[in-house]
């Protein structure tokens, strides 16, 4: 057959690799990453496109390049006379910068790319996205007391700096989306005051997908995290979800007689560096989850640290050289490390590490009523481990991954609430455990180690020695599939 033979018969048509190109959810006025599709000629005849155009011209914000030709204003957002020989193909590139829509929820943005053959036959590919109006902040410096409280998402470029005499308050329900170069540096005070129903969310700004099954929001290293400098004190992160950072929370060395950070009912998840790193600081962690970090979930180098009713789960999926759930050393001097009613676990056989100090430096620490994936202490330091459950790494029925409701390594989805098989159930001390868990569920007379109090599904009543009669609440998801969100 002559590949140079072109037909004008309407019996022949092109084949598209998709009939609808979805560009995920995007922030209005912010360019999307480029997506592509292919146009194939499998008809047996050569075909000419007399016209390719955007149906709405420049009204939707889509930008299209067809086989190297940009459909811009000079060409009237169209092109013509494109040959697609038999068994050949052309590639189409699509981007979107959507205009503001004035709405508080994502709005559908849609256009059709129309392909008209010489025969007059018209074919189309639908271009579709959801556009979300956002407030854009660039290199924000807080020099006086300021509250950020927005119904719309806030996208941060370049970062936020809180001056030494200023307090930045993040109101409940606030969502901050950080670009890759952005984070928060605190010289003064940061107060993130989320609630159980409306947490503050700090995350990266990419709403698209790396793969169809994997949103970038589940990929670590998307932004730069929070740094509390030496002059910063009295910081509060309450009901705050911090995820997909590089280093999440760093505390510089400072006066340990003043509390530097109180982390309460919060989540730190999926970090390409460490989760929390405290260098000779006063740190309190309560009812919180720190999980899946390339570095240590929690690392303490001296200072004064109190940990209660918290979960440290080291299941970082992107690198087998992940560190531990907890590392501590005396650093320049340790006042105390006191861990109570908490769960330390992960993939490795030992996820709790410490560096023995020089004889001149004390290392006062203690673990009470904790579940720990580490070797049982047999030295004189065993007196520092009181009512501790040591995980047996060979036991795969109730330790490690078996503690938790969902460890989905294929789709990188995690729910660190307790499963009914967990050895953390009833392992805490009723006298010192927090009265409610990270979700606001009341702890019973035999409380559980970690941030989550086990909730038995209704079908499984009675459970946990007939003492726990709670309906399972909806799981807190650490990530939102933006395609599902936008569909609502």
Question: Which stretches of residues belong to each language-model region?
Answer:
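Surface-exposed binding patches on compact interaction domains or structured appendages
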Residues: 1-20, 42-95, 100
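Beta-strand/loop edge motif enriched in small/polar residues
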Residues: 13-25, 30-31, 36, 75-414, ...
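Short, ordered coil/turn segments that flank beta-strands lining enzyme active or ligand-binding pockets
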Residues: 42, 438, 482
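Disulfide-bonded cysteine-rich modules in secreted/extracellular proteins
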Residues: 135-143, 463-469, 473-474
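A recurrent domain-boundary module in secreted/ectodomain proteins
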Residues: 442, 447-467
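C-terminal outer-membrane/trafficking sorting elements
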Residues: 469-488
């Amino acid at each position: 057959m002559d590949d140079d033979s072109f037909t004008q018969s309407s019996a022949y048509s092109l084949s598209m690799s998709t009939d609808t190109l979805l560009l995920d959810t995007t922030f209005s006025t912010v360019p999307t990453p480029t997506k592509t599709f292919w146009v194939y000629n499998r008809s047996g005849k050569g075909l000419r496109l007399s016209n390719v155009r955007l149906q709405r011209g420049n009204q939707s914000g889509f930008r299209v390049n067809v086989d190297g030709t940009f459909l811009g204003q000079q060409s009237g957002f169209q092109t013509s006379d494109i040959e697609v020989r038999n068994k050949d193909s052309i590639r189409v590139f699509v981007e979107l910068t959507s205009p503001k829509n004035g709405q508080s929820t994502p709005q559908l943005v849609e256009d059709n790319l129309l392909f008209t053959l010489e025969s007059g036959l018209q074919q189309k590919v639908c271009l579709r996205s959801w556009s979300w109006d956002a407030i854009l902040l660039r290199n924000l410096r807080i020099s006086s007391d300021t509250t950020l409280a927005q119904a719309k998402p806030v996208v941060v470029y370049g970062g936020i700096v809180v001056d030494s005499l200023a307090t930045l308050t993040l109101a409940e329900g606030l969502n901050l989306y950080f670009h890759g170069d952005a984070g928060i540096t605190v010289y003064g005070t940061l107060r993130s005051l989320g609630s159980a129903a409306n947490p503050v969310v700090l995350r990266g700004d990419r709403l698209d997908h790396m793969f169809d099954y994997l949103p970038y929001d589940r990929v670590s290293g998307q932004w730069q995290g929070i740094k509390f400098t030496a002059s910063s004190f009295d910081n509060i992160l309450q009901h705050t979800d911090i995820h997909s950072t590089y280093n999440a929370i760093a505390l510089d060395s400072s006066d340990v007689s003043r509390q530097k950070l109180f982390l309460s009912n919060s989540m730190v998840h999926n970090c390409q560096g460490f989760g929390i790193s405290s260098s000779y600081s006063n740190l309190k962690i309560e009812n919180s989850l720190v999980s899946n970090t390339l570095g240590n979930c929690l690392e303490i180098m001296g200072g004064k640290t109190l940990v209660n009713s918290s979960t440290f789960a080291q299941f970082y999926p992107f690198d087998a050289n992940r560190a531990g759930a907890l590392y501590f050393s005396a650093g320049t001097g340790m006042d105390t490390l006191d861990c109570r009613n908490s769960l330390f676990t992960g993939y490795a056989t030992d996820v709790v590490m410490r560096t023995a100090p020089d004889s001149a430096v004390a290392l006062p620490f203690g673990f009470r009523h904790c579940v720990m994936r580490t070797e049982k202490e047999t030295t004189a330091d065993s007196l520092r481990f009181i009512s501790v459950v040591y995980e047996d790494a060979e036991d795969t029925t109730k330790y490690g991954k078996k503690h938790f409701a969902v460890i989905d390594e294929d789709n990188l989805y995690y729910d660190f609430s307790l499963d009914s098989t967990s050895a953390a159930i009833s392992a805490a001390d009723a006298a010192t455990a927090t009265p409610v868990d990270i979700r606001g569920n009341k702890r019973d007379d035999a409380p559980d180690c970690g941030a989550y109090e086990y909730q038995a599904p209704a079908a499984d009543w009675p459970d946990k020695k007939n003492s726990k009669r709670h309906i399972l609440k909806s799981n807190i998801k650490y990530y939102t599939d933006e395609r599902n969100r936008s569909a609502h």
